[in-house]
């Protein structure tokens, strides 16, 4: 399936991105913990010098607070890293139309979109670059392939080019129904899964 291929490609890119920034995350974590430990030691040393009878209790309290603050910082840093990785994946998504496999993915996205709509005459909306990539003969081939499956006449026509990264938007002729299979929409629909996978790769 076209959308599945895109999701798989996104997760592959996530894996590559994760390996690059995971070491940075570890360095940041070590720095936070070390700073917290030094801060706690300095404060408790001052207390011990003053002969505070409750030094041990105070020391433990400061250390507990330091660990809590460290954990909060780590959680915030983790979220920042996940967001950074996702933004990197969004940038990588813009490069997908340049790949050799893109035309095959695009054709599958068109087929998925057509199959999801109950209509005989449908409009295929592409960006300007893909308007040239997908020739009329390719749409005719899709018509024939799907007609044999659904046992009804299907007419596909190109619509006006859209401002999308890639992929397609399939609409009924009257415009009342549509399936948005643009690359960015496929990405957003799979965001929950992408975030979960990025998190598992990073941590």
UniProtKB/Swiss-Prot annotation:
Chief place where the protein resides: membrane
Entry keywords, A to Z: ATP synthesis, Cell membrane, Hydrogen ion transport, Ion transport, Membrane, Transport
Any matching Pfam family: vATP-synt_E
Entry's Gene Ontology molecular function annotations: ATP binding; proton-transporting ATP synthase activity, rotational mechanism; proton-transporting ATPase activity, rotational mechanism
SUPFAM superfamilies: F1F0 ATP synthase subunit B, membrane domain, V-type ATPase subunit E-like
GO CC terms, sorted: plasma membrane; proton-transporting two-sector ATPase complex, catalytic domain
Membrane-related topology note: Peripheral membrane protein
InterPro entries the UniProt entry points to: ATP_synth_B-like_membr_sf, ATPase_E_C, ATPase_V1_Esu
Gene3D superfamilies from the UniProt entry: ATP synthase, E subunit, C-terminal (3.30.2320.30), F1F0 ATP synthase subunit B, membrane domain (1.20.5.620)
Biological process annotations from GO: proton motive force-driven plasma membrane ATP synthesis
Subcellular compartments: Cell membrane
General function of this protein: Component of the A-type ATP synthase that produces ATP from ADP in the presence of a proton gradient across the membrane.
Family according to the record: Belongs to the V-ATPase E subunit family.
Subunit (UniProt): Has multiple subunits with at least A(3), B(3), C, D, E, F, H, I and proteolipid K(x).
Name listed for the protein in its UniProt record: A-type ATP synthase subunit E
The organism of origin for this protein: Methanococcus aeolicus (strain ATCC BAA-1280 / DSM 17508 / OCM 812 / Nankai-3)
Gene: atpE
């Amino acid at each position: 399936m076209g959308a599945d291929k895109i999701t798989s490609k996104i997760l592959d890119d996530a894996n590559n991105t994760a390996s690059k920034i995971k070491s940075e995350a570890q360095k940041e974590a070590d720095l936070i913990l070390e700073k917290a430990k030094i801060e706690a030691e300095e404060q408790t040393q001052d207390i011990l010098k003053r002969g505070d009878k409750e030094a041990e209790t105070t020391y433990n309290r400061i250390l507990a607070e330091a660990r809590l603050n460290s954990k909060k910082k780590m959680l915030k840093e983790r979220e920042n890293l996940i967001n950074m990785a996702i933004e990197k994946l969004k940038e990588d998504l813009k490069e997908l139309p340049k790949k050799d496999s893109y035309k095959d993915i695009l054709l599958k996205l068109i087929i998925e979109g057509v199959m999801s709509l109950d209509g005989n005459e449908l409009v295929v909306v592409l960006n300007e670059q893909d308007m040239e990539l997908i020739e009329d003969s390719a749409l005719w081939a899709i018509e024939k392939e799907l007609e044999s499956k659904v046992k009804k006449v299907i007419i596909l026509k190109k619509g006006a080019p859209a401002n999308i990264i890639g992929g397609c938007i399939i609409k009924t002729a009257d415009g009342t129904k549509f399936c948005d299979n643009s690359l960015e929409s496929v990405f957003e629909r799979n965001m929950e899964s992408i975030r979960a996978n990025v998190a598992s790769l990073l941590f």
